[in-house]
Amino acid sequence: AGFAGDDAPRAVFPSIVGRPRHTGVMVGMGQKDAYVGDEAQSKRGILTLKYPIEHGIVSNWDDMEKIWHHTFYNELRVAPEEHPVLLTEAPLNPKANREKMTQIMFETFNTPAMYVAIQAVLSLYASGRTTGIVLDSGDGVSHTVPIYEGYALPHAILRLDLAGRDLTDHLMKILTERGYSFTTTAEREIVRDVKEKLSYIALDYEQEIETAKTSSSVEKSYELPDGQVIPIGAERFRCPEVLFQPSMIGMEAAGIHETTYNSIMKCDVDIRKDLYGNIVLSGGTTMFPGIADRMSKEITALAPSSMKIKVVAPPERKYSVWIGGSILASLSTFQQ
């Protein structure tokens, strides 16, 4: 969250609401019945953490309202009734979701004006393009959205319910198989941190597995909050490999490379060349080192042999949806 015209968000925190697992015994400590974002994160040992957004769609409106309240009053420290608001949503979101969002903004927060933009379109804005296909992969959902001259092509948008949270779950499972126990909502956050700090995507998965067996070049170590150090080896690339092989976690879906290709194939034959040449990655789950090269390799294998393929992975892609929103909301034409 932040202000239009800024080049980076002022506040970045996880969409989590945490409630105490135990009853407070210390009188006068000012214990809250709910914690949001980083505060929930830091007290996670005594809380049950809930994510009000599932697969990019809000499933718990009371908690979502808490998060927005926290954003306005504690993070940005603004009065929402004094500022127009730009919110974003996943493509192909149910219409009722957007209506509920609008209702809360106007009725609970009294915002003077609001607009709901599609996330992937904003990422393309941020990359300075008007044509391209965006693969946007966050915590709960991934999408491929082809955009031509600024228009999203709804018939070719594909959605993949596979994203960061699934990778964290997969890593939890791999580590459990190795004898480490991560079960609570708080421990899941530790695993997420392992994933974000150490994972990478192999250019050739089979070959990387062989390398990991014979050499220790892949091994890194991670220190848990209690001081215990665990070695992380092949898990580093086994975890995000799921993006290219969803069957590893029992999903029948196509991987992100194939989904991108399928999305392009649903577009008019005349514009495919422009899409192949502008494949833009966005969202936190595209932050793995090696993802652009692997994506490029996989799509080259699927596309016609003469096709020029370019995968763009802007360094700020974790926040490119926000940056695109900042650009859009500061245009004078938009404000009218």
Curated annotation (Swiss-Prot):
Keyword match Oxidoreductase: no
Origin superkingdom: Eukaryota
GO cellular component, one term: actin cytoskeleton
Pfam family, one: Actin
GO molecular function: ATP binding; hydrolase activity
Substrates-to-products reaction catalysed: ATP + H2O = ADP + phosphate + H(+)
Enzyme class: hydrolase
Cross-referenced Gene3D superfamilies: 3.30.420.40, Actin, Chain A, domain 4
EC number: 3.6.4.-
Keywords linked to the UniProt accession: ATP-binding, Cytoplasm, Cytoskeleton, Hydrolase, Nucleotide-binding
Amino-acid biosynthesis listed as a keyword: no
Matching PANTHER family: ACTIN
Other facts noted in the record for this chain: There are at least 13 actin genes in potato.
Function summary: Actins are highly conserved proteins that are involved in various types of cell motility and are ubiquitously expressed in all eukaryotic cells. Essential component of cell cytoskeleton; plays an important role in cytoplasmic streaming, cell shape determination, cell division, organelle movement and extension growth.
Similarity comment: Belongs to the actin family.
Name of the molecule in the record: Actin-79
Native species: Solanum tuberosum
Source lineage: Eukaryota, Viridiplantae, Streptophyta, Embryophyta, Tracheophyta
